[in-house]
Amino acid sequence: MHHHLNTLYQGQSLSRESTRDAFGQVVRGEVDPIVLASLLTALKIKGETPEEIAGAAEALLAEARDFPRPDYEFCDIVGTGGDGLNTINVSTTSALVAAACGLKVAKHGNRSVSSKSGSSDLLDKMGIKLDMSPAQARRCLDELGICFLFAPQYHAGVRHAMPVRQALKTRTLFNVLGPLINPARPTYQLMGVYAPELVRPIAETLLALGLKTGMVVHGAGLDEIAIHGPTQVAQIRDGEIREFLLTPADFGLETYPVSAIQGGEPEENRAITAAILEGRGTPAHNAAIAANVAPLLLMAGKAKDLKSAAAEVLAVLASGKTAELAARLATLSHQEASHQEA
């Protein structure tokens, strides 16, 4: 580890292999907290490269609990959190809606980082069991087209870094790792980042990790596609990255103020999500979901352009069938537990 630190102290970047080695030691609990603080701080001050981020992600994936990966195409929609704007749970709600649109979604999530209610906080309130086994999660993915993978269940080793992260009180490499370490390893992905300068490096990281199709976005202050302004996009396709801007008009949607998608406490966010899923969402809420699900439909080849994709999402929202899917997921997520108790 000290060899890696000396490289960083000289202002040089680590190789992917070196970073993989360093973070493998971290998640196995082999690194002294003071040394770990030095590692994270040195990386932060130098600026983490895509190779370093990819190496760290590979280390965490190598140490993760196994998930029985399916051989069909499936996706994830996830944000880094940390944008500080406390909006409604767009990515979690979008994951459910994407499944109702016929996609397969394995959503990797955790408790709140930035908003008052992270994806796991919301699922808890909806009665969806967070700590189901990998086999049961796979069953949900097969039968319902959606499963949620609770990060601490798959990445237990990350707990070794938690005291240092909390003591440092600043963003570190760990803040961008969550969306990159889905243990199911989705075949395509929409990932939101908390800062515009991360869009390109994170796209390069996903490409280095072998993602074939994906999109990294930052939406005018949000870690998701914005309905209140332009969204910076880095699109991954056929081994290349293309950068462009998207506006609500590109989806055939109106522009709304960011205040129109403000979230609240977990109970309040659950009520907002329930309304959206039941077809009672506000126009702004529906637009936010449509904008974030539409690219997934396009990546999956289920729509010809973003406007027709967004229109399809709005139709699915209006039908209320996503609420039925969420209820079935809540039931199925608990079946294994009741079976074992019997």
From Swiss-Prot:
Residues that hold Mg(2+) 1 according to the record: S91, E224
EC assignment: 2.4.2.18
Gene Ontology MF term list: anthranilate phosphoribosyltransferase activity; magnesium ion binding
Cofactor: Mg(2+)
Gene Ontology cellular component terms for the protein in this record: cytosol
Residues binding 5-phospho-alpha-D-ribose 1-diphosphate: 79, 82-83, 87, 89-92, 107-115, 119
Subunit and interaction comment: Homodimer.
Chain sites annotated for binding Mg(2+) 2: D223, E224
Cited Gene3D superfamilies: Nucleoside phosphorylase/phosphoribosyltransferase catalytic domain, Transferase, Pyrimidine Nucleoside Phosphorylase, Chain C
Protein name per its UniProtKB record: Anthranilate phosphoribosyltransferase
Organism in which the protein naturally occurs: Aeromonas hydrophila subsp. hydrophila (strain ATCC 7966 / DSM 30187 / BCRC 13018 / CCUG 14551 / JCM 1027 / KCTC 2358 / NCIMB 9240 / NCTC 8049)
Pathway: Amino-acid biosynthesis; L-tryptophan biosynthesis; L-tryptophan from chorismate: step 2/5
Tagged with keyword Transport: no
Matching Pfam families: Glycos_trans_3N, Glycos_transf_3
Taxonomic lineage of the native organism: Bacteria, Pseudomonadati, Pseudomonadota, Gammaproteobacteria, Aeromonadales
